[in-house]
C-alpha cells in the first residue's frame, strides 16, 4: 500500500514537472525565435539557449513516453527492439540537452572571466569557433555512446537467445540495466567535468578581480564583479541539478535489482532537471524575464475581463 502511494506521488510530480518543463522551454524557444524574426539577427548566447530549450523539450517527451510505456507494460521494456529504440532516443535527447548547457557554461566563462594567459585570450577572441568545435567533438562522443550501447544490447540479446533459462528476473537480465547506467554515466560525466572546470576558473577569476579591486575601490561592486556573480549563479544552478542527476544515476545503479521501484524516482529526477533549470534561465535572463512578466500581466488582465463578463 505504501509502495503504491509513493508511486502515485512520483507520477504526480512527473506530470507536473513535465507540464512546467514544456511550458518553460517552449516559452524560451518561442520568445527567442520571435525576436530573431523581428531583428533578423540573434546573439550566440540566444542561439545556445534556444537550442537548449528545444533539446530539453525532446528530452522531456522521450523520458515521459519511455516511463509511461514501461509503467503500463513492465515486460515490454525488456524487448530487444524496445530497448534499442528507447535507449538510442534517450541518449540523443540527453546528449544535446547536457552539451548545449555545457556550451552555455563555456560561453559565460570565455565572455566574463579575465585572464592574461595567451591560450585564454586566443579562445576568447574565437569563442564562436570554440562553441562550434565543442559541439562537433560532442558528436563523436554521441556516436561512440550509441555504438557502445548497441553493441552491449546485441551481446545481451545473443546471450538471451542462447540461454533457454534466461528470463526477465534472471541475474543476467538484472545486470543489463546496471551496465546501461554505467555507459550513460561515463559519457555524461565528460560535459559535467567541462562545466565544473569552467565554474572553478570563474571563481578563480572573480577572486583575482576582487583582490585587485581592494586597492582601488574597497567594498564596492563594479560591473565586472556583478557579471562574474551572475555567470556563477547560472553555472551553479546547472551543476547543482547535474549533481542531483548523477546521484540518481548512482542510486539507480546500486538498486537496479529492484528496478521497478526506482523507475519513477529516476524519471522524476531526469524530468525535474530540464524543467526547473529552464525556469531559472528565464528568471536570470532579462529579456526572457521581461517577456514572462508581460505574459503574466496579459493573462491577469484576461482573467479580470472574464470575471467582469460573468454575471
UniProtKB/Swiss-Prot annotation:
It is a multi-pass membrane protein. It is found in: Membrane. One of its GO terms (molecular function) is G protein-coupled receptor activity. Residues 1-9, 69-89, 151-186, 252-262 are extracellular. The keyword Transmembrane helix applies. Residues 33-47, 111-129, 208-230, 284-311 are cytoplasmic. It holds the Pfam family TAS2R. The keyword Transmembrane helix applies. The chain crosses the membrane at residues 10-32, 48-68, 90-110, 130-150, 187-207, 231-251, 263-283. Its main location: membrane. One of its GO terms (cellular component) is membrane. Glycans are attached at residues 87, 163, 172. Keywords: G-protein coupled receptor, Glycoprotein, Membrane, Receptor, Sensory transduction, Taste, Transducer, Transmembrane, Transmembrane helix. Putative taste receptor which may play a role in the perception of bitterness. Several bitter taste receptors are expressed in a single taste receptor cell. Belongs to the G-protein coupled receptor T2R family. This is Taste receptor type 2 member 125. It comes from Mus musculus (Mouse). The lineage of its organism: Eukaryota, Metazoa, Chordata, Craniata, Vertebrata.
Amino acid at each position: 500500500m505504501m509502495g503504491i502511494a509513493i508511486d502515485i506521488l512520483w507520477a504526480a510530480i512527473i506530470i507536473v514537472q513535465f507540464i512546467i518543463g514544456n511550458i518553460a522551454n517552449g516559452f524560451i524557444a518561442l520568445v527567442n525565435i520571435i525576436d530573431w524574426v523581428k531583428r533578423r539577427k540573434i546573439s550566440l548566447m540566444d542561439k545556445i539557449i534556444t537550442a537548449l530549450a528545444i533539446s530539453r523539450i525532446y528530452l522531456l517527451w522521450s523520458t515521459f513516453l519511455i516511463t509511461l510505456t514501461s509503467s503500463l507494460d513492465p515486460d515490454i521494456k525488456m524487448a530487444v527492439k524496445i530497448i534499442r529504440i528507447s535507449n538510442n532516443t534517450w541518449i540523443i535527447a540527453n546528449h544535446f540537452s547536457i552539451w548545449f548547457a555545457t556550451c552555455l557554461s563555456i560561453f559565460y566563462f570565455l565572455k566574463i572571466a579575465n585572464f592574461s594567459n595567451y591560450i585564454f585570450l586566443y579562445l576568447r577572441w574565437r569563442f564562436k569557433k570554440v562553441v562550434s568545435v565543442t559541439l562537433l567533438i560532442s558528436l563523436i562522443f554521441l556516436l561512440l555512446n550509441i555504438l557502445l550501447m548497441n553493441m552491449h544490447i546485441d551481446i545481451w540479446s545473443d546471450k538471451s537467445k542462447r540461454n533457454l533459462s534466461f528470463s526477465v528476473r534472471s541475474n543476467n537480465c538484472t545486470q543489463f540495466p546496471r551496465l546501461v547506467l554505467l555507459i550513460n554515466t561515463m559519457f555524461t560525466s565528460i560535459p559535467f567535468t567541462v562545466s565544473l572546470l569552467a565554474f572553478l576558473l570563474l571563481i578563480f577569476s572573480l577572486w583575482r578581480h576582487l583582490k585587485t579591486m581592494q586597492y582601488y575601490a574597497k567594498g564596492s561592486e563594479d560591473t565586472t564583479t556583478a557579471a562574474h556573480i551572475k555567470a556563477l549563479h547560472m553555472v551553479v544552478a546547472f551543476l547543482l541539478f547535474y549533481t542531483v542527476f548523477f546521484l540518481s544515476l548512482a542510486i539507480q545503479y546500486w538498486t537496479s535489482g529492484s528496478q521497478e521501484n526506482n523507475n519513477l524516482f529516476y524519471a522524476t529526477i531526469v524530468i525535474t532537471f530540464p524543467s526547473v533549470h529552464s525556469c531559472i534561465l528565464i528568471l536570470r535572463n532579462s529579456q526572457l524575464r521581461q517577456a514572462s512578466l508581460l505574459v503574466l500581466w496579459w493573462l491577469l488582465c484576461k482573467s479580470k475581463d472574464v470575471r467582469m463578463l460573468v454575471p
